[in-house]
Regions:
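The feature marks proteins involved in alpha-glucan
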Residues: 1-23, 42-118, 123-128, 139, ...
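Glycan-recognition and catalytic regions of carbohydrate-active enzymes
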Residues: 8-10, 353-373, 424-425, 430-439, ...
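Conserved, mostly hydrophobic/aromatic
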Residues: 26, 67, 119, 140, ...
Length: 578
């Protein structure tokens, strides 16, 4: 398969040639004629076959351009920069012009040693930009963080949003600082010893971009239905150029922005019946570009094929999020059994996910009313990312409230001392009290109204509050309330420092037989080499047997005592002994 035979395999978008020209290439089988409008002139793109059209014209990095489809002006589907947002022109970018200083960087910590920190650029600082985040990197590195995980930065509607309604999947969000700002942040992160993982959304596009994309070609398929809109066309007629558009996006983040890993959003909504699944192909492309680059999946499948090697028939992701760990822990701590939480809440389930990362590994799910999942017996603990808070589990609550302060110490204890790869959500390390609410800045009135109404409708069935009280996503105050205040609890901050310090002393891996619990108490006990984790999930004190332990290494609460082979724990408290 050569580029001459399949023209979509060549670089899409605007590629500066270094000789005062730029090659513009786009997949556009739908229109009769396509021009590129740049420097005040139109230039017709010549057909290359399979709907690919191209032209090399006099232009340079920094020039704005638009494609003109039978007279209709539209941005480039492969745009690298939308300086005026979704409706403005694209801008030619030469990513090679950035003066990188990370020549000695080799990818950062291995997964088994990783501690990930999820952040939203727009609310992480008052300024809400890539550049403003740089000042906080040394502090995160000193805490023990090894990788930042940026929520999506592909160009989305307006000036603020979560990023999951992005349209231009290769363009760094203009309101955050555009491509140059992202390169600055990554370069500074590497200087601070931090890797950077980028959250990317390849299961759908934001509704604001559907009409534009459909003008070019069949980027979407009607074969499948997804919650957020139209499914991307990975296996229907004319899907090859669409696949390549996504693959070039993934590769471009790693190559041109020195991104150390991709977090793939909701892969259970990526539908592909091709002989070679798009996720296998994406892993091939990314790992060929950088063999140390990470691909981490958010999967609602509980299927070990996600991380199984491609050589063994899997999709080859390096790791996946382990939602069941969060659900088992949160419900046990809070008693919140709404929605899909309804089947969680027993300490035996938390013990199970300490042994293996899925609560449902082929057994019956009462929420789904069917058997669900498969045993991950051939997978390793460093292939699963765990958390007690993240953007979804906080922000998809009606008011975006974080874990209650009274249970956060025990939640952090379980998460950070687990055998898995821990991830923190921005601000939890010092007990941030600002909520993280669902906010948008849609530029299309119909979409804005539908989003706000949908949010109210989603929570109308809950008797604990009125749907009218649910924050309006389009109200700027909803966004502003979600910015970090950086005010918290010094005791929580000290606990996180100690937990992350102690984590480095724990042996790698785990023994599934070294986990037990008392459902009646309820308490959990996990042995990790010479160490034993003991957690009391009751609202009253408990005494947990820890035979042979002679040292209290760490306790989440005062009033914890170790004596005579037992550790006495206050309510909702944890201790590490050896």
């Amino acid at each position: 398969m050569s580029a001459a035979e399949y023209p979509w395999e060549r670089a899409l978008g605007a590629v500066p040639g270094g000789d005062g020209t730029v090659e513009f290439r786009v997949w556009a089988p739908h229109p009769g004629r396509v021009d590129v409008r740049v420097r005040g002139a139109d230039h017709e793109l010549r057909p290359e076959g399979h709907g690919i059209r191209s032209a090399r014209v006099e232009a340079a990095a920094g020039d704005d351009y638009l494609f003109v489809l039978d007279g209709r002006e539209l941005p480039d589907p492969a745009s690298r920069w939308q300086p005026d947002g979704l409706r403005g022109p694209s801008r030619v970018v030469d990513p090679r012009s950035f003066a990188w200083t990370d020549g000695g960087w080799h990818g950062g910590a291995e997964l088994q040693d990783a501690v990930i920190y999820e952040l939203h650029v727009g609310t992480f600082t008052e300024e809400g930009t890539f550049e403003a985040a740089i000042d906080h990197l040394p502090g995160l590195a000193a805490l023990g963080i090894t990788h930042l995980e940026l929520m999506p930065v592909a160009e989305f509607p307006g000036a603020h949003g979560w990023g999951y309604d992005g349209v231009y999947i290769s363009a760094a969000q203009s309101s955050y600082g555009g491509p140059h700002g992202l390169q600055q942040l990554v370069d500074a992160a590497h200087a601070a010893g931090l890797g950077v993982i980028l959250d990317v959304v390849y299961n759908h596009l934001g509704a604001s971009g559907i009409s534009a994309m459909e003008a070019f070609g069949p980027y979407f398929t009607e074969k499948y239905e997804i919650f957020w809109g139209k499914a991307i066309n990975f296996d229907d007629a004319d899907s090859d150029p669409v696949r390549e558009w996504v693959l070039q996006s993934a590769e471009g983040w790693v190559r041109d922005f020195h991104i150390d890993g991709l977090r793939l959003d909701a892969i259970h909504a990526i539908f592909d019946m091709s002989a070679k699944h798009i996720l296998r192909e994406l892993n091939d492309r990314v790992h060929t570009r950088n063999h140390r680059a990470l691909v981490i999946a958010e999967s609602g499948l509980n299927d070990p094929k996600v991380t199984r090697p491609r050589s063994a028939g899997g999709w080859g992701c390096d790791a996946e999020w382990a939602d069941d760990f969060h659900h088992a822990l949160r419900v046990l701590l809070t008693g919140d059994k709404t929605g899909y939480y309804e089947e969680f809440g027993r300490v035996e389930q938390l013990a199970k996910v300490f042994r293996r990362p899925y609560v449902h590994d082929g057994d019956y799910s009462t929420f789904r009313r069917r058997r669900f999942g498969a045993p991950p017996t051939d997978r390793h603990v460093d292939q699963f990312v765990v958390f007690d808070q993240n953007h979804d589990q906080v922000g998809n609550r009606a008011f975006g409230d974080r874990l209650p302060a009274e249970v956060q110490p025990l939640a952090a204890f379980c998460t950070l001392l687990s055998p898995y790869v821990p991830m923190l959500f921005m601000g939890e390390e010092y007990g941030e009290t600002a909520p993280f609410q669902f906010f948008t800045d849609h530029i299309d009135e119909k979409i804005a109204v539908a989003t706000a109404e949908g949010r109210r409708r989603e929570f109308s069935a809950f008797a604990s509050f009125s749907a009218e009280d649910v924050p309006d996503p389009q109200d700027a105050e909803t966004f502003l309330r979600s910015k970090l205040t950086r005010e918290g609890d010094e005791a929580i901050r000290a606990l996180y420092v100690r937990l992350l310090d102690v984590r480095r002393e724990l042996p790698a891996g785990h023994d599934a037989d070294a986990v037990d619990c008392d459902p009646a108490a309820p308490w959990l006990r996990v042995r990790r080499g010479p160490f034993t984790l003991a957690g009391n999930f009751a609202e009253t004190p408990a005494s947990v047997p820890v035979e042979g332990a002679g040292e209290l290494v760490l306790a989440t609460h005062d009033g914890t005592h170790l004596a005579n082979g037992r550790v006495d724990l206050p309510a909702r408290a944890g201790a590490l002994v050896r």
